[in-house]
A protein has these predicted regions:
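Aromatic-anchored segments of alpha-helical transmembrane domains
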Residues: 27-34, 78-81, 173-177, 261-270
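C-terminal membrane module of polytopic membrane proteins
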Residues: 255, 271, 280-326
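Interfacial segments of alpha-helical transmembrane regions
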Residues: 69, 148-181, 188-196
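Membrane-interfacial catalytic/cofactor-binding modules of polytopic membrane enzymes
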Residues: 178-248
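Membrane-interface loop-to-helix entry segments
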Residues: 132-146, 226-248, 276, 280
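N-terminal transmembrane-helix/juxtamembrane module of multi-pass inner/ER membrane proteins
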Residues: 1-48, 60-63, 67-71, 75-147, ...
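Interfacial helix-loop-helix junctions of multi-pass membrane proteins
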Residues: 186, 230, 263-288
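Membrane-interfacial alpha-helical segments at the cytosolic side of multi-pass membrane proteins
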Residues: 149-156, 236-254, 284-293
């Protein structure tokens, strides 16, 4: 019995040491990433730090609904940063952005004319902001819907949350490498900066936002984030993987989820934020995640067990030393 307690104590102390290391890492990583521009921290340092942050948060947070919220919040910030990093690095190296290839593909898909051009010609008045512009911009602005749905699943169907959240995270993971490998200008940027598509495509979202603020119309802007992160559409990839999760809970929920995917796909193409090929690539990313799940799940479950052991090490330490007894 005494030997078993000694072994438990040693094992628990090891996990507790790891947990303390993660606890120290979290604020350090947050500070490093937040100050990266001011300090001139290179992407090769920032990327590993922000990528490990959600795992560190999971390791120091006891298993509960709050743990899902904490990890989800850290992961969304991690995605935002990893989405911005390629553009930040590219500004320093002046690496060119791809412009022509999506236009060629979309011209084939659109029967000679890119779908964005067709939609804006048919449905827009380029001189003003219409009710349709506002409605479609509202759909685009609802990109948080998949994350709100995850919150609803957590409250109403918690047994589905590990798979649903894991697949959404994997979807974001698969989109970010493309922003490094093939930085692609969206339709509005290709039209405005390079005169592609006869300069016809406008950034409708800019006009809607300025109209809502009662600001004068402007034909150019300095976009925050990553204006060359068009391929693939993470917006559509996230919506599609969430629709798949809803379909597993109930067919009616699945119909609602896929209806949102259709509306969001129309919105990003109409607004000039994405090409149709970006949308199709986003759907392909979601499908790839679903197909790969059976092969990746054993590794993920093992990682989850390790993180659970680390997170519960404080309680185990109390029991091993006798402090947990009344």
């Amino acid at each position: 019995m005494q030997r078993g307690l000694l072994r438990l104590r040693r094992s628990t102390n090891d996990w507790l040491t790891v947990r303390c290391g993660f606890a120290a890492f979290v604020p350090a990583a947050v500070a490093l990433v937040s100050l990266r521009k001011r300090l001139g921290v290179p992407a090769v340092v920032t990327l590993p730090a922000i990528s490990l942050l959600p795992l560190a948060v999971a390791a120091i947070t006891p298993l509960s609904k709050w743990r899902y919220i904490a990890v989800g919040t850290s992961y969304m910030w991690a995605f935002k940063v990893t989405w911005e990093l390629p553009y930040e690095a590219r500004k320093k190296t002046q690496r060119p952005v791809h412009v022509r290839y999506p236009i060629r593909i979309d011209s084939l898909l659109g029967g000679g004319v890119p779908p964005t051009v067709r939609l804006q010609r048919a449905l827009r008045d380029p001189t003003t902001v219409t009710p349709l512009d506002r409605a479609v911009a509202g759909i685009y602005a609802s990109w948080l819907v998949p994350h709100l749905i995850l919150g609803w699943i957590l409250l109403r169907h918690p047994q589905f949350i590990p798979r649903a959240a894991g697949r959404l995270a994997a979807t974001y993971h698969l989109t970010t490498p493309f922003y490094w490998l093939i930085p692609t200008a969206p339709p509005w940027l290709a039209s405005e900066s390079s005169g592609e598509m006869n300069g016809e495509v406008q950034r409708v979202l800019r006009h809607v936002i300025r109209d809502l603020r009662n600001q004068p119309r402007r034909e150019t802007d300095n976009s925050p984030g990553n204006p060359s992160g068009s391929m693939p559409s993470d917006h559509i990839a996230a919506a599609a993987i969430t629709a798949m999760a809803l379909s597993e809970i109930d067919v009616a929920y699945g119909v609602l989820g896929w209806s949102y995917v259709v509306l969001a796909s129309f919105a990003v193409v109409y607004l000039g934020e994405h090409y149709l090929i970006d949308v199709l690539a986003g759907l392909a990313v979601a499908q790839t995640v679903r197909r790969a799940e059976p092969f990746v799940s054993p590794f993920v479950r093992q990682l989850a067990r390790v993180l659970k052991q680390i997170a519960s090490s404080t309680t185990k330490s109390s029991l091993a030393t006798g402090d947990g007894h009344p």
